[in-house]
Every structure is written in structure tokens, then in C-alpha cells.
Amino acid sequence: MKDIKCIIHLADIHIRNFQRLEEYSEQLTKVVDKCKEIASEYDKEEVRILIAGDLVHSKNTISNELMVFASYFLRQLEEVATVIVIAGNHDLIVENQARTDTMTALFDTADFQNCKFLDAMLNYKSGCAIDNNVVWCLYSIYEDFLRPTTIEEVKESNPNAKMIGLFHGQVVGSTLNNGYVSDSGLDGEAFEGCDCVMAGHLHKRQVLKRGDTEIVYPGSLIQQTYGETVSQHGFAVWNVEDMSYKFVDIDSDYGLYDVEIDSVNDVDEDKERLINF
């Protein structure tokens, strides 16, 4: 088995039931093409594509269009490299886990060949999964982001592996799109033992550092609301050897523009001010 050298880290895709599907089709095609370009520099076994939660938008209210669209997108990605998916708060009803969630339904019916739903593999609990030279340390939303109890044990038995935290939630001190700095969420100490954390949930791209561990949010793949910036939507690409990363933007012909004016005359005089670039 070849070592993993590259991880393409996506999050917060939010595929709708039927809304904006033309836009999503164009943008996700660009994403797949960019993933192919990045992965072409490696052997297929050396690349992983991670979706760090919120593949879909409407929790358990799903449509035929969504199931076809989401499964087609994942099939395209799994042709590029092995895909790892974790659940986010829009992929299930957190308060009613007795209901079958959308990710479980999708993976139970789609018969993916190279796409893995990590929460299901770990029996919907936090835990560690060894993947060649990487250990995926899942802080599962199904278990309220409990810290995996086996991190130290697995790290001791796999001393050369990269311990990568997977988390879809908020960290104390993270920043929302409106500029609010959160005082709720997981404390950074929860990620002790991880070499990095590949996170989702916050649509504002940002990097936090807690101790020696960087927590990276690539931001939403596609602009979701007027409250988000028009720019800086895409994903992160990781070099596993040194745990460095870079952000990749996906250009869009679509946008939700928040414009400020002092009076209607500003429109006539082209003096509108774009405030969410």
C-alpha cells in the first residue's frame, strides 16, 4: 500500500433538493475537474478526497433530484481518488437520530466503490480509523463530538502516522461570517494528540491554532447566502508529509451581492458599494 501524500479537503457543499441545481452542476463540475488536475500529480492510491460534513442542505427532507445529484457527484470524485465523508449538522436531524439520516440512506443505496462514510464505519461513534500512513480521528456529530478515546493508544502503535482530526462543528474562538467571535463549541484541548484538524461547519474560511495543532476550515464550497463573501469559496489541499496546506478558490459566474447605498441616486451614479466581497 502506498503512503497518502495529498488530501483534498472539502466541506459545506449544501446540495439542495432542487434549488440552484444548474449553478451547482456548473460549480461541482469545476470542482471535479480541479481535483483531477491536482490528483494527476500523484498515483491514485496516494490521494484522498475528504468531505468534512454538510454534503446536503435540508437534513432528512430529501428529493429524488438530490439523491441522484449527490450520488453522481460522489461517483465522479471516487473515480479520482478514495473519498472519505463525515456527517455534518445538515446531513441528519441531530435531535432525532432514531430517523435514518440522509448520508446513511445515500450510502446504503448508492453502492459506491471507492467512497467511505466514516461515521457508519465507526458505528456512528467517535473513533480512529487507520488508513495507510494516516489515522482519521473522527469527532463524530452522532456522539456530540466526543473526543476519540483511542487517540493515544493508536498513536503509540502507529508512531509514524499522521493523526488527522475530523470535525464538523464550532471551536471556541472561531469567527462567524458576521464577525462574531464564538464563545461556544469545542475547546481546543479536545484536539490534543492530533497533528492537524480538517474541519467543516463554519462557512468563513479560517485557520485556528490551539497548542501545536492547526484547525483548518476551508469555508463553504459555494456561496450560500448574502451573509457570506462572494469570494474565497473552494477547498484546501494538504501535503501530508509536512502537514502544509493551501487554499484553492473555485471561480463562479454566480453570486449573491450585498450592496450598500446612501440614496437611490447612488444607483444612477454607479456609486453602490459592495460590502460582501
Named regions from a protein language model:
Residues 1-73, 79, 150, 156-159:
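N-terminal active-site segment of His-dependent metallophosphoesterases
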Residues 3, 21, 60-216:
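His/Asp/Glu-rich metal-coordinating catalytic cores
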Residues 8, 135-137, 236, 255:
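Conserved beta-strand elements of the Class I
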Residues 12, 54, 88, 168, ...:
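Cofactor-binding loop segments of dinucleotide-utilizing enzymes, especially the Rossmann-like FAD-
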Residues 13, 89, 121-123, 142, ...:
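Short, solvent-exposed coil/turn elements at secondary-structure transition points
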Residues 15, 57, 171, 204, ...:
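Short, glycine/acidic-enriched loop or turn micro-motifs at the edges of active sites
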Residues 16, 58, 92, 145, ...:
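Flexible, glycine-rich phosphate/dinucleotide-binding loops
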Residues 129-130, 216-277:
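Binuclear metal-dependent phosphoesterase catalytic core
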